[in-house]
Amino acid sequence: SVGFKAGVKEYKLTYYTPEYETKDTDILAAFRVSPQPGVPPEEAGAAVAAESSTGTWTTVWTDGLTNLDRYKGRCYHIDPVLGEEDQYIAYVAYPLDLFEEGSVTNMFTSIVGNVFGFKALRALRLEDLRIPTAYVKTFQGPPHGIQVERDKLNKYGRPLLGCTIKPKLGLSAKNYGRAVYECLRGGLDFTKDDENVNSQPFMRWRDRLLFCAEAIFKSQAETGEIKGHYLNATAGNCEEMMKRAVFARELGVPIVMHDYLTGGFTANTTLASYCRDNGLLLHIHRAMHAVIDRQKNHGIHFRVLAKALRMSGGDHIHSGTVVGKLEGERNITLSFVVLLRDDYIEKDRSRGIFFTQDWVSLPGVLPVASGGIHVWHMPALVEIFGDDSVLQFGGGTLGHPWGNAPGAVANRVSLEACVQARNEGRDLAREGNDIIREACKWSPELAAACEVWKEIKFEFTDMDTLD
C-alpha cells in the first residue's frame, strides 16, 4: 500500500470530478464562485466542495480510517456566468449521509457554515439547492399548509388580507388592541405584530396577547368571519418562545408568528412542531434576510432560504411584493413563490431555478406580499400572486385619512373588485386602474384612499437581477 503521505495538495485532485453522475439521493448545490486572481475555477469549485464536506487544508492520516469516496462532496460541473468577469456557477453534489435527518440547522452548518470565509475566494453565493425526496421526507414542513388553512378560516377563491400594526413600536397594549380591532372589523382577515414587537417595556407580551385576543373575538362576532392576529412568539430563548405560543393557544387564537432567521432554524422547527400538534397556524417573518441575500455575488439567495423555511415549517412567509417599497424583481420573486406553493417545480434558468424540485406532497406555504403597497397596487398584486397569497397593507391601511376601519374597508373593496373582474375575464394588468376607479363609485372609503396614494411610487433599480 502507498501509506499516509503528509503535505498539502490541490483540492481539485480529490474534489473536482466532472465525470461524476449525480444520484437521486444527493443534495445538489449551485454556488456563484468568485475566485481570487490566479485561482482556477476548478480549484475554487473543488475547494468549496471540500471545505463544506470532508476536506481540510492539508492531508490528514485519519482520512485512511474512512471511505472518502462515499462521504466527500464533489464539484461536478462549472459554468461561467454570462456578462460577469471571473464569476462561475460551481455545481456541488453532497452524499445524503453527510446530513442529520430533519435538521435544517445541520444542513446549513455543513453547506455554508465554514466555506464563505475561505481566502481563495473573493466572494461566494449559494444560489440554489436541490433537496432530494428522501431528505424532504424527514421533515414535517409547514404546520398545516395552504388547504388546511383555508379550511380553518373558511375563506376560498381570493387572496387573504393582512395589515401590520403601525407605529411598530411605542403603542400601549390597549391602544394596540384597539388598532387590531378596527382593522379586523373593517374587513381584513389578519393583523400582524411587526417583526421587532416582542416584549418591550412599553408593551409586555402577555398584555398584548390579551388585548389582541379581545379584538379578534369582538370583530369575529360583529362580522361573522374568522379573524386572526399574528402574535409574535419570538423571544430571547426557546423556553420563553414556547411559553408565548402556549398562552396564545390557551386564549383560543388561530395563529402565531416567528422571526425565523433571527430566531434560528432550531427554534423555528420546534415552534412549527408545536403548532401542528396544537392546531395553530404559523406566520413567518424573514427579518434579517437582506443581510444574507441582497448582494448578488455573496451570501445566500432567498430561494434557498425559502426552501429551508418550507422544510423547517411555516404557513406564511414574506416574499416581497414586486411593486412595493422593498427589493423584489418580478421573475425572481415568482421563482420562490412557486417554490413555496407548488408540489413539483421544473428547472427554469430564466427564473433563476437551477434544479427541478419535487416536494413529494410536503404542505405549501402562502407567500406574503408586504411593504409599501396600497390600493392602486391591488390589481397587479392579484395578477402576480393569485389567490394563494396574503396581501398585507400596513401604512396602506392605517394611513387612510379616515382611520383604520375605513382603510381596511378600502382594501377589502378593492380586492373584491379585482377578484370579480378577473373572474369575469378582464385583464387586470391592462384594466387595473379602471377597475379600481369603478369600485370607487360605490365605496367612499376606497375613493378617499385612491386620492391619498395616487402619486406614490417606489422606482428604484433592483439589486438582485437575473443573469
Curated annotation (Swiss-Prot):
<feature type="binding site" description="in homodimeric partner">
    <location>
        <position position="114"/>
    </location>
    <ligand>
        <name>substrate</name>
    </ligand>
</feature>
<dbReference type="Pfam" id="PF02788">
    <property type="entry name" value="RuBisCO_large_N"/>
</dbReference>
<keyword id="KW-0503">Monooxygenase</keyword>
<feature type="binding site">
    <location>
        <position position="370"/>
    </location>
    <ligand>
        <name>substrate</name>
    </ligand>
</feature>
<feature type="binding site">
    <location>
        <position position="195"/>
    </location>
    <ligand>
        <name>Mg(2+)</name>
    </ligand>
</feature>
<keyword id="KW-0120">Carbon dioxide fixation</keyword>
<keyword id="KW-0113">Calvin cycle</keyword>
<dbReference type="InterPro" id="IPR020888">
    <property type="entry name" value="RuBisCO_lsuI"/>
</dbReference>
<keyword id="KW-0488">Methylation</keyword>
<comment type="subunit">
    <text>Heterohexadecamer of 8 large chains and 8 small chains; disulfide-linked. The disulfide link is formed within the large subunit homodimers.</text>
</comment>
<keyword id="KW-1015">Disulfide bond</keyword>
<feature type="site" description="Transition state stabilizer">
    <location>
        <position position="325"/>
    </location>
</feature>
<comment type="similarity">
    <text>Belongs to the RuBisCO large chain family. Type I subfamily.</text>
</comment>
<feature type="binding site" description="via carbamate group">
    <location>
        <position position="192"/>
    </location>
    <ligand>
        <name>Mg(2+)</name>
    </ligand>
</feature>
<dbReference type="GO" id="GO:0009853">
    <property type="term" value="P:photorespiration"/>
</dbReference>
<keyword id="KW-0934">Plastid</keyword>
<keyword id="KW-0601">Photorespiration</keyword>
<feature type="binding site">
    <location>
        <position position="168"/>
    </location>
    <ligand>
        <name>substrate</name>
    </ligand>
</feature>
<keyword id="KW-0150">Chloroplast</keyword>
<feature type="binding site">
    <location>
        <position position="164"/>
    </location>
    <ligand>
        <name>substrate</name>
    </ligand>
</feature>
<feature type="modified residue" description="N6,N6,N6-trimethyllysine">
    <location>
        <position position="5"/>
    </location>
</feature>
<dbReference type="GO" id="GO:0009507">
    <property type="term" value="C:chloroplast"/>
</dbReference>
<dbReference type="GO" id="GO:0019253">
    <property type="term" value="P:reductive pentose-phosphate cycle"/>
</dbReference>
<feature type="active site" description="Proton acceptor">
    <location>
        <position position="285"/>
    </location>
</feature>
<keyword id="KW-0456">Lyase</keyword>
<dbReference type="Pfam" id="PF00016">
    <property type="entry name" value="RuBisCO_large"/>
</dbReference>
<feature type="active site" description="Proton acceptor">
    <location>
        <position position="166"/>
    </location>
</feature>
<dbReference type="InterPro" id="IPR000685">
    <property type="entry name" value="RuBisCO_lsu_C"/>
</dbReference>
<comment type="function">
    <text>RuBisCO catalyzes two reactions: the carboxylation of D-ribulose 1,5-bisphosphate, the primary event in carbon dioxide fixation, as well as the oxidative fragmentation of the pentose substrate in the photorespiration process. Both reactions occur simultaneously and in competition at the same active site.</text>
</comment>
<feature type="binding site">
    <location>
        <position position="286"/>
    </location>
    <ligand>
        <name>substrate</name>
    </ligand>
</feature>
<dbReference type="InterPro" id="IPR020878">
    <property type="entry name" value="RuBisCo_large_chain_AS"/>
</dbReference>
<keyword id="KW-0460">Magnesium</keyword>
<dbReference type="GO" id="GO:0004497">
    <property type="term" value="F:monooxygenase activity"/>
</dbReference>
<feature type="binding site">
    <location>
        <position position="194"/>
    </location>
    <ligand>
        <name>Mg(2+)</name>
    </ligand>
</feature>
<keyword id="KW-0602">Photosynthesis</keyword>
<feature type="binding site">
    <location>
        <position position="318"/>
    </location>
    <ligand>
        <name>substrate</name>
    </ligand>
</feature>
<dbReference type="InterPro" id="IPR017443">
    <property type="entry name" value="RuBisCO_lsu_fd_N"/>
</dbReference>
<protein>
    <recommendedName>
        <fullName>Ribulose bisphosphate carboxylase large chain</fullName>
        <ecNumber>4.1.1.39</ecNumber>
    </recommendedName>
</protein>
<keyword id="KW-0479">Metal-binding</keyword>
<dbReference type="GO" id="GO:0016984">
    <property type="term" value="F:ribulose-bisphosphate carboxylase activity"/>
</dbReference>
<dbReference type="InterPro" id="IPR036376">
    <property type="entry name" value="RuBisCO_lsu_C_sf"/>
</dbReference>
<dbReference type="InterPro" id="IPR033966">
    <property type="entry name" value="RuBisCO"/>
</dbReference>
